[in-house]
């Protein structure tokens, strides 16, 4: 399936081994590609991510259900199916409340929003019109953003969907039906939301299961532009299906560093240490109180899975792990995200996925000192019991 488009419808870092009285491995964020210029720091790299009618505004598109749709300035629209109703939520509901005087400047209607005075409204055709209300739709807002290849970026935004309308006593959305709220990015700068290069995050919860949902994804740019997609896929025909988007943001991602070391005196004790940075953008968010939270994990091929050392660890730290094997490679990684602790900072809070730092480290066995057999005694070989061998 191909999206239709037009103006309105348009290292892993391997560580360097250091050997002095201890062995050490170190990983840090990747550097921008040669010849690139670091991007200018800004609190939000998206244009019109709050969808405010009285700020960045909207432009008109084609007629749907008797009137021209409204599309946020700075964004294009792509659709797999027939276009649904798209509008400024503020203007739509103000005009529904007062067709003569209602508009962007009035405040007489309830508007579903999270940030500012407005949000972006997406609504199925024939919302409550028999005999086939709530036509399926699959539509995305699309914006290209200047990036630097090799630099990680993080997207975070909010959506809410209403399958079966907003009535909740009870809500009648059939079991198995859903509206997929999706936030994605193509790190190659491609414009096709159906391409395999797009990295997606998705949430299918209805409004009565958590209301507004935060969607977030982190990606390393592979080109001079990255394409952002804010999408709602409503694949089932059901009455009342509609959704809202608000508070969409993109920043240069937070970064992490990680080291691993062991001493000759105790080579099976590996100390893992980590640190990181919010990056140049997040610190510019007005009234923000963002901190770094880490997940620290390690891997050995005999495990087959990553094992956790720390979860939601606040700030820089260290952890000493007892390894069971020497002269064999372990991998350690630090996964970082930036968010605000409960009750702090600016609303709505965003959660920014950071670039993962990963290293490989091989704790070395101490050198064996040569021994001499006792005079006149043959030497013996002792084989240890397999069950007594430590787990790697």
What kind of feature is each model-predicted range?
Residues 268-288:
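Conserved aromatic anchor
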Residues 285-307:
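Extracellular low-complexity, O-glycosylation-prone stalks/linkers
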Residues 339-366:
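Extracellular fibronectin type III
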């Amino acid at each position: 399936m191909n999206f239709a488009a037009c103006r309105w419808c348009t290292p892993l870092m391997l560580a360097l081994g250091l050997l002095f009285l201890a062995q050490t491995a170190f990983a840090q964020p990747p550097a921008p590609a040669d010849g690139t210029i670091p991007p200018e720091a800004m609190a939000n790299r998206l244009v019109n991510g709050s969808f405010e009618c009285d700020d960045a505004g909207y432009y008109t598109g084609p007629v749907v259900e008797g009137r021209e749709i409204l599309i946020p300035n700075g964004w294009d629209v792509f659709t797999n199916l027939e276009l649904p109703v798209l509008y400024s939520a503020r203007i739509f509901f103000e005009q529904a409340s007062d067709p003569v005087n209602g508009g962007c400047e009035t405040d007489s209607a309830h508007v579903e929003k999270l940030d500012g005075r407005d949000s972006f409204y997406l609504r199925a055709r024939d919302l409550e019109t028999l005999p086939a209300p709530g036509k399926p739709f699959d539509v995305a807002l699309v914006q290209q953003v200047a990036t630097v290849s090799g630099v990680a970026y993080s997207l975070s935004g909010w959506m809410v969907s209403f399958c079966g309308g907003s009535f909740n006593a009870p809500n009648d959305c059939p079991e198995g039906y859903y509206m997929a709220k999706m936030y994605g990015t193509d790190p190659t700068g491609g414009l096709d939301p159906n391409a395999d290069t797009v990295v997606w995050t998705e949430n299918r919860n209805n409004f009565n299961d958590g209301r507004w949902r935060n969607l977030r994804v982190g990606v390393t740019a592979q080109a001079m532009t990255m394409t952002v997609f804010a999408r709602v896929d409503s694949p089932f025909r059901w009455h009342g299906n509609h959704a809202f988007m608000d508070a969409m943001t993109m920043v240069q991602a937070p970064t992490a560093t990680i080291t691993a070391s062991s001493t000759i005196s105790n080579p099976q004790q590996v100390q893992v240490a980590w640190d990181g940075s919010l990056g140049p953008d997040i610190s510019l968010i007005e009234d923000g109180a963002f901190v770094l939270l880490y997940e620290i994990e390690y891997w050995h091929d005999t495990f087959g899975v990553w094992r956790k050392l720390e979860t939601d660890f606040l700030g820089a730290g260290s952890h000493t792990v007892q390894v069971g094997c020497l002269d064999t490679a372990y991998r350690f990684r630090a996964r970082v995200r930036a968010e605000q602790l409960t009750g702090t900072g600016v609303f709505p809070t965003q959660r920014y996925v950071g670039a993962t730092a990963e290293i490989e480290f091989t704790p070395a066995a101490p050198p064996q000192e040569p021994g001499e057999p006792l005079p006149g005694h043959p030497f013996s070989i002792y084989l240890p019991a397999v069950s007594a061998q430590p787990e790697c």
